[in-house]
Amino acid sequence: MRFRSLISLLFLLFFTSSAYARFVSLNPSSTSLISDGIDGGSNLAGSGSVIKSVVSAPAEEKEEACEQTYGFMPCTKTALGNVFLILVYGFLMFTAATYLSAGSELLLEILGPGIVGGLFLPMLGALPDAMLIMVSGLSGDAATAQSQVSVGMGLLAGSTVMLLTVIWGTCTVVGKCDLRDSIAVNNQDTKGFHLKDSGVTVDIWTSYAARIMAISVIPFVIVQLPQMLGSTSGRQLSVLIALILSVLMLISYCVYQVFQPWIQRRRLAFAKHKHVISGILRHLKQHALGRLLDDEGQPDEHVIRKLFLTIDANNDGHLSAAELKALIIGISFEDIDFDKDDAVGKVLQDFDKTLDEQVDQEEFVRGIKQWLIQAMGGAPSGPEAGPRTMKFLDNFHVQTKREHALLGDNENGENDEEGGEVADPKWITIKAALLLLLGAAIAAAFADPLVDTVNNFSAATGIPSFFISFIALPLATNSSEAVSAIIFASRKKIRTASLTFSELCGGVTMNNILCLSVFLAIVYVRGLTWNFSSEVLVILIVCLVMGGFASFRTTYPLWTCFIAYLLYPFSLGLVYILDYWFGWS
């Protein structure tokens, strides 16, 4: 049904064209009628003159005709007509983004993450924005491109600001859960809109994504340096340097995305191993009555040797893999799921220095001492650090549990990204390819008409095209991503919240490097003037505020949504004041 509606809309658009008319007066006294010299009031003579006046329309009215994109797309000079066309073209761009998103998800089901998830999906997500930015600077001669390129900058700034303010704040509100020990409790939302005791928690990878997003604004700073220094020379050079850097950052980001699943698995395996260490030490503490440390705060070898004897079930002086596995199975790890055999292998790797697949008493003592020193970390040592300071083991346990949770391990084997085994890979691949091609074709076909319509609406209303593209165009190109992010966040889990905010940071990062690369390439190749100081300042402020905030914390209390929401009107007001009060543009 949706596809038929799209075809019908395209059909109407293609067979619609602009039309112009003149008001014709039949009043014989009209000055537009030419007398025949016999009867000035003759209706017949007047009618003949009317025909002549209609046939020979004035030249200035012909010049007022709007220019049709591609020579056949509809256009109009009226404000309401352009509003209608903006809605139509915006819907088509939204449809293109939806098709690209659906095709990307299907492709991800077939090929999995890695190259597809790290290389193609981020680029496909930014494709509609990149198309609009590209056509805004390629239309007409250099003077026309210079006047239209503000549409591309408005879209670039508007998309970044909308994702990090309105969408970010909304995801915080719909995804909030109760906070316990500064960590959100999955699927528990009993405290309503309490500003401090409810919020969302994300994994550590979201913090990394936020840091990358903050770093991605460096090309903006470089291209803005000549204006900051008050220099008129070197502007083209700064554009070229920023272009090269943004392309290099794009390549680096894609490589990082490709290898991130492998990095994440390594980090998660290390966190699980630390959790096993914590569990074994707490278990030994209980059996040693809390005397793992002597009066000097050092590991007590005598107690550790006694513990070895209690674990050595067959009294052969060695701990085999089976005995270590029995020890691990007997310890409660609070629903942390991990491979017991893998855990035994890592314990052997820490203890077994002779590589004989078993642990003797000396190796056990040496290994436990190293674990205790690792767990003590910054705990006090010396005479005052006796058995009473064994609380450091509990602190170490809390720390390892938190690290494990923040690394985003799937609870109970759950995976929110995978829907199971694909039934018909061949058909899914064909469907994904068709959706991607259709989405790319729609975006390419209607990007130019949308830019022209925005400029026509700006001319008809006197509203700067930047503000129109800043507010309206991101709604068209990012609506699909925004809706899916909000729906995903509403599942109220740490994992889904992490994926949601990581996607928001990733989308902004692609805007800052991919879309900016396209924009800078157009400015450099066509020799356009870079004059977007206020817009760059807004992007820097929003990215650094939200990126800095998300870089150093993994829990967002509900009150933080107000910061995000307030940044949107602040950004609009700042651009207006700088451009029209201080004349920055």
Curated annotation (Swiss-Prot):
The record's InterPro entries line, in alphabetical order, gives: CaH_exchang (IPR004713), EF-hand-dom_pair (IPR011992), EF_Hand_1_Ca_BS (IPR018247), EF_hand_dom (IPR002048), NaCa_Exmemb (IPR004837)
A GO molecular function term, named singly, is: calcium ion binding
Q: Where in the cell is it found?
A: Cell membrane; Vacuole membrane
Tissue localization of expression: Expressed in roots, leaves, stems, petals, stamens, ovules and siliques.
Protein's membrane topology: Multi-pass membrane protein
Per UniProt, Ca(2+) 2 binds at 352, 356, 358, 363
Residues recorded as binding Ca(2+) 1, renumbered to this chain, are 312, 314, 316, 318, 323
On induction, the UniProt comment says: Induced by salt stress. Induced by cold stress, heat shock and abscisic acid (ABA). Induced by calcium and magnesium chloride, and osmotic shock.
Name a GO CC annotation attached to this entry: vacuole
Q: Glycosylated residues?
A: 478
Q: Which residues cross the membrane?
A: 83-103, 106-126, 149-169, 212-232, 239-259, 427-447, 457-477, 505-525, 532-552, 558-578
Give residue ranges for domain EF-hand: 299-334, 339-374
Q: Enumerate the SUPFAM superfamilies for this protein.
A: EF-hand (SSF47473)
Q: Name one GO biological process term.
A: calcium ion homeostasis
Highest taxon in the source lineage: Eukaryota
Effect of disrupting the coding gene: No visible phenotype under normal growth conditions. No visible phenotype under short day (SD) conditions, but early flowering under long day (LD) conditions.
Function recorded in the entry: Possesses sodium/calcium exchanger (NCX) activity when expressed in a heterologous mammalian CHO-K1 cell system. Does not possess cation/proton exchanger (CAX) or sodium/proton (NHX) activity when expressed in a heterologous yeast cell system. Has the ability to bind calcium in vitro. Participates in the maintenance of calcium homeostasis. May play a role in auxin response, diurnal rhythm and flowering time. Involved in salt stress response.
Instruction: Spell out the protein name for this chain.
Output: Sodium/calcium exchanger NCL
